[in-house]
């Protein structure tokens, strides 16, 4: 059953050895290798399939609810029979191309593909075993090693290979009714995932997140919205979180600490400076903090309380880390502090030995002004 049926826009067609279910922009073909169909039912099979009695005269119809069956004959005691079922998920192309693709898949040696796939992922785990964990000597170590390997295998499932966008958690329910709805990219969440990626020597994946996804999703004013689809499009949001913006700057410097790549810092410097400019304006708007004026603890607390109650702010008040309450929160302020600290460290790491800065008075003056404001 296809769950994404809307207004009877899902159809089914019987093909050689199976069936093809399709909508306007996708198709799911289910078919067997070396076995012909015994029976099928395109319409109303939800109840009949429970009795194992499916039959239909139609070869095509509008239905999200279809079924097929195969006859394996009599299976004797201790006897094994193999039924290889292929599931082909693809875009909905023209019919002849789809049928050609089904023919191609039926000719694939599945045992060979299984062995090749297993070998690939074993090499992948070995390449990213940066902690150098050895084979387990007891059940406790065995459990740790299992979680460790599964963690390595998980990260490729989280990341969009084209944009570098990283979802917070995998989802299996396309209707988002029986899950946490975490198959989106929160910049903050992704930043902490890239820290784990760095530990596991996934440098390319981390750099793609910053150099492609973050640049693609940064707003003109320098901020990042709450969450996105991994292709970079804005996802439904319910407010603003200032730590989304601050975390990206922090993450850029954290990645540099692993790689020591000045090129990576230079490639992302402009993006970080735009974010820092936004954070400074945000603080000025909500806390009325300018320059290096000293304030004692009570004065800061008083200013925060007064600021929250004032009307006419340019920027929307931020949600907390868990999106429960709007206001000025310790974690949010800490993330901004970390962003300011990170940009100062980025400037320090780049120094004056970067060709773009040499003899560039305007650039150097901007950097010095930025540093003074932050400090």
Where are these regions (language model features)?
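Aromatic-rich carbohydrate-recognition surfaces in CAZymes
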Residues: 182-290, 297, 303-304, 333-337
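Catalytic cores of carbohydrate-active enzymes
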Residues: 182, 221-228, 288-375
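Extended, well-ordered alpha-helical scaffold segments
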Residues: 98-120, 143-150, 201-216, 262-282, ...
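N-terminal start-of-domain structural block
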Residues: 161-162, 168-186, 212-218, 222-223, ...
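Acidic/polar, glycine-enriched structural segments that form the non-catalytic walls/loops
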Residues: 2-181, 262-263
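Well-ordered alpha-helical scaffold segments within catalytic/enzyme domains
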Residues: 87, 128-142, 153-157, 191-203, ...
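Solvent-exposed loop and edge beta-strand segments that line ligand/cofactor-binding
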Residues: 120-127, 134-140, 172-190, 197-198, ...
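Extended hydrophobic/Leu-rich segments
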Residues: 2, 12-14, 20-26, 31-32, ...
């Amino acid at each position: 059953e296809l769950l994404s049926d809307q207004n009877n826009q899902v159809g089914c067609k019987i093909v050689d050895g199976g069936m093809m279910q399709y909508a306007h922009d996708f198709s799911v073909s289910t078919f067997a290798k070396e076995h012909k169909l015994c029976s099928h039912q395109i319409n109303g099979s939800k109840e009949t399939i429970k009795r194992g009695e499916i039959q239909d005269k139609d070869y095509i119809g509008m239905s999200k609810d279809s079924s097929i069956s195969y006859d394996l004959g009599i299976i004797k005691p201790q006897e094994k029979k193999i039924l290889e079922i292929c599931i082909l998920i693809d875009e909905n192309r023209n019919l002849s191309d789809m049928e050609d693709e089904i023919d191609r898949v039926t000719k694939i040696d599945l045992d060979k593909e299984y062995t090749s796939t297993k070998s690939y992922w074993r090499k992948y785990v070995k390449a990213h075993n940066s902690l150098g964990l050895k084979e387990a000597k007891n059940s406790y170590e065995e459990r740790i090693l299992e979680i460790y390997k599964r963690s390595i295998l998980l990260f490729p499932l989280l990341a969009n290979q084209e944009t570098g966008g990283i979802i917070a958690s995998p989802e299996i329910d396309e209707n988002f009714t029986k899950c946490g709805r975490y198959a989106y990219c929160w910049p903050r969440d992704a930043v902490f995932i890239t820290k784990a990626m760095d530990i596991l020597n996934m440098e390319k994946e981390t750099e793609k997140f910053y150099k492609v996804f973050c640049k693609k999703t940064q707003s003109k004013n320098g901020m990042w919205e709450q969450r996105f689809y991994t292709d970079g499009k804005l996802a439904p949001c319910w407010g603003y979180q200032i730590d989304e913006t601050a975390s990206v700057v922090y993450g850029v410097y954290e990645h540099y600490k692993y790689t020591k790549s000045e090129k990576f810092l230079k490639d992302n410097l402009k993006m970080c400076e735009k974010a820092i400019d936004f954070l400074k304006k945000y603080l000025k708007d909500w806390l009325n903090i300018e320059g290096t004026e000293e304030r004692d603890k009570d004065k800061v607390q008083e200013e925060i309380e007064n600021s929250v109650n004032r009307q006419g702010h340019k920027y929307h008040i931020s949600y907390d880390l868990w999106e429960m309450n709007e206001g000025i929160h310790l974690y949010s302020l800490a993330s901004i502090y970390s962003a300011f600290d990170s940009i100062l460290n980025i400037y320090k790491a780049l120094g004056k030995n970067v060709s773009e800065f040499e003899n560039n008075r305007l650039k150097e003056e901007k950097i010095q002004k930025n540093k003074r404001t932050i400090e």
